[in-house]
């Protein structure tokens, strides 16, 4: 098979060398990320059930999860969740195989509850959320296309990836991971709903962090603002590991502390969805974990899509893998790589309509020596695209 692979040189300033760069990451507890995480957990559970009972992954797309914020009354020392967050599971799945009925509602609700319990320890899953599964049967046309032996694209869409990450992108990504990872041992009062906005102008990187605080760990406003000052220094200490540039850190900038009035970002569960903040699948991070307006991006939601033939999932992940592999294998001659893969419904997923690679080279590099290597690499990764399926099912590939 001769695939349509285009490799071309791109003449433009690499993103890290532009005057301004903006990067965002929504943390795991942000309502949009909660929706993404649940959608993907539901897809994984359905896939495992289908494999166990029928030997293959059957048609499903569970990428329509909505998080509708509840109501809470946080206060220093510990408040209350007054109304639970409503979580709607929607999409399509194979609900009947021959005469067998698939217990899809039980599977999907359990998957959502298990995901929330595993990741958000301050959330009472029995009382603080209400989960409703409205997942229905897929359309006949899509079910017919969804034949795992044919492995044909079930949509006409595209995926986008780039590499390498800039210092700003790396810093934003790892700041959130630090706050929702290692820092929790030292500062358990920092909640899971964290958003990091990075803005670089020339040689100064500004990090604005919104971090929900868990009220039961904080006794009063004075302690809250002391914690905030400590958190600012810890974020700065972590951030400077990724750059030699000047870094400025801002924490919870909507807080008020003036004229005897003190208002902070306080929550009961460490998640803003408890008090009116809503979320949807695909409205947050792309598959590389970032929102990058200075880069090419796909608007496709990857979380919850089937991992066998849905190119909105496969091509976005594969594009990023290809871009990173090119940078890794072709060495320091590469400044930046942009990969786009376009599908055509009904066409084999390993034979896209086009796989386009654009490369920004460092200095006066003879790019001809890289062109064939890149083409061969892309061809190989496309030939093995089906290897991604079980990695998705096993939760080895992040999609937000």
From Swiss-Prot:
- Stretch forming the signal peptide: none
Q: Which positions bind ATP?
A: 136-141
What this protein needs as a cofactor is:
Mg(2+)
Specify the enzyme's EC class, one word: transferase
Q: What is its EC number?
A: 2.5.1.6
* Known function: Catalyzes the formation of S-adenosylmethionine from methionine and ATP.
UniProt-recorded name of the protein: S-adenosylmethionine synthase
The species this protein belongs to is: Thermoplasma acidophilum (strain ATCC 25905 / DSM 1728 / JCM 9062 / NBRC 15155 / AMRC-C165)
Q: By which gene is this protein encoded?
A: mat
